[in-house]
């Protein structure tokens, strides 16, 4: 063979080996690769949605609309309405509102007809913190107090009747702008802290202010009567020669009971026999007496 042809053949082989070759994939390999890609995308989407839900719960932005068909949604709307009516009452807005006005101000106009009917016929009507006035709804506090004078009268009535004080939280719930009113009353009221750290307001009766000896105060506080009832305390005082105010006071005279008159006895009536022979019979008693 011609040597020039051999050289050209070798060069052709070298060029063929240096050029890259792309092969076609089979159908089975293509389907497997596509399914694996789909699985990866699904996992990524699921993970992202789960992370979004977890982030929503962690941030506290829980949507009530997700529970629109459950009882939790209904009671959540009810709690929001009651809290809103309470806050507006404390601001001084005491005029009643219709249900549509309440739903508008609480941003719940998109609730269903069933939930709206439930609020109108059951939930708001039977709620102890809501009162119905001419088809409208208003907040109903524990005490009807509108100003500081009414608060002072209420505390005075509790003091005179021996009912004690009133919780500060009940006054804050009932009286609009309660902090200003309490501050304005000054020394006319007293504050007492309970063991559970709740504050109680009392009427400060200045006519009852007098000095008591410290020794007497110590003796008074040292006496424990927690485990004794009223009967045991009364028996102990009697043994010590101390009588109660009930015994020393005027005794009530028992009313005189009038005797009932005995009922008059009715004459007995005897049944007479042979009444049909009254005109035929004769009396022979005179003849027998003469013999």
UniProtKB/Swiss-Prot annotation:
Q: Which residues bind DNA?
A: 66-146
Which Gene3D superfamilies does this entry report, sorted A to Z? Winged helix-like DNA-binding domain superfamily/Winged helix DNA-binding domain
Pfam families for this protein: TFA2_Winged_2 (PF18121), TFIIE_beta (PF02186)
Its keywords, alphabetically, are: Acetylation, Disease variant, DNA-binding, Nucleus, Phosphoprotein, Transcription, Transcription regulation
Name a single GO biological process: transcription by RNA polymerase II
Q: Where is the composition biased (Polar residues)?
A: 50-62
A GO cellular-component term linked to this record: transcription factor TFIIE complex
The effect annotated for residue 150 to P is: In TTD6; reduction in the levels of both TFIIE-alpha and TFIIE-beta subunits of the TFIIE complex in patient cells; reduced phosphorylation of TFIIE-alpha observed in patient cells
> What InterPro entries does the annotation carry?
TFA2_Winged_2, TFIIE-bsu, TFIIE_bsu_DNA-bd, WH-like_DNA-bd_sf, WH_DNA-bd_sf
Primary localization class, coarse: nucleus
Renumbered to this chain, region (Disordered) spans 1-63, 243-272
- Entry's localization field: Nucleus
Q: Where is the composition biased (Basic and acidic residues)?
A: 1-13
Residue positions, PTM N-acetylmethionine: 1
Indicate the impact reported for residue 187 to Y: In TTD6; reduction in the levels of both TFIIE-alpha and TFIIE-beta subunits of the TFIIE complex in patient cells; reduced phosphorylation of TFIIE-alpha observed in patient cells
The Phosphoserine modification is found at 61
Which spans does this entry mark as compositional bias, Basic residues? 257-271
Name the domain of life this protein comes from: Eukaryota
What Gene Ontology terms describe what this protein does at the molecular function level?
DNA binding; RNA binding; RNA polymerase II general transcription initiation factor activity
- What is known about what this protein does? Recruits TFIIH to the initiation complex and stimulates the RNA polymerase II C-terminal domain kinase and DNA-dependent ATPase activities of TFIIH. Both TFIIH and TFIIE are required for promoter clearance by RNA polymerase.
Q: Which disease relates to this protein according to its record? A: Trichothiodystrophy 6, non-photosensitive: A form of trichothiodystrophy, a disease characterized by sulfur-deficient brittle hair and multisystem variable abnormalities. The spectrum of clinical features varies from mild disease with only hair involvement to severe disease with cutaneous, neurologic and profound developmental defects. Ichthyosis, intellectual and developmental disabilities, decreased fertility, abnormal characteristics at birth, ocular abnormalities, short stature, and infections are common manifestations.
* PANTHER family hit by this protein: TRANSCRIPTION INITIATION FACTOR IIE SUBUNIT BETA, TRANSCRIPTION INITIATION FACTOR IIE, BETA SUBUNIT
Give the UniProt family note.
Belongs to the TFIIE beta subunit family.
Q: What is this protein called?
A: Transcription initiation factor IIE subunit beta
């Amino acid at each position: 063979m011609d040597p020039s042809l051999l050289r050209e053949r070798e060069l052709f082989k070298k060029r063929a080996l240096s050029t890259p070759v792309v092969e076609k994939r089979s159908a089975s390999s293509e389907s497997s690769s596509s399914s694996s890609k789909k699985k990866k995308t699904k996992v990524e989407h699921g993970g992202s949605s789960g992370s979004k839900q977890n982030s929503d719960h962690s941030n506290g932005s829980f949507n009530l609309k997700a529970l629109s068909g459950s009882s939790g949604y209904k009671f959540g709307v009810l709690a929001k309405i009651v809290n809103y009516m309470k806050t507006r009452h404390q601001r001084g807005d005491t005029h009643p509102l219709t249900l549509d006005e309440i739903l508008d101000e609480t941003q719940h106009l998109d609730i269903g007809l069933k939930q709206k009917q439930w609020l109108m016929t059951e939930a708001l009507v039977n709620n102890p913190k809501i009162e119905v006035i001419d088809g409208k709804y208003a907040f109903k506090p524990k005490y009807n107090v509108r100003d500081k004078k009414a608060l002072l009268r209420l505390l005075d009535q509790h003091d005179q009747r021996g009912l004690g004080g009133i919780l500060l939280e009940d006054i804050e719930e009932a009286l609009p702008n309660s902090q200003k009113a309490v501050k304005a009353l000054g020394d006319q009221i007293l504050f007492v802290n309970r063991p559970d750290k709740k504050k109680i307001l009392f009427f400060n009766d200045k006519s009852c202010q007098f000095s008591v000896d410290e020794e007497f105060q110590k003796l008074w506080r040292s006496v424990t009567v927690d485990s004794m009832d009223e009967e045991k305390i009364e028996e102990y005082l009697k043994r010590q020669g101390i009588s109660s105010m009930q015994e020393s006071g005027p005794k009530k005279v028992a009313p005189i009971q009038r005797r009932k008159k005995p009922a008059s006895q009715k004459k007995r009536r005897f049944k007479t026999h042979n009444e049909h022979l009254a005109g035929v019979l004769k009396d022979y008693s005179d003849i027998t007496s003469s013999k």
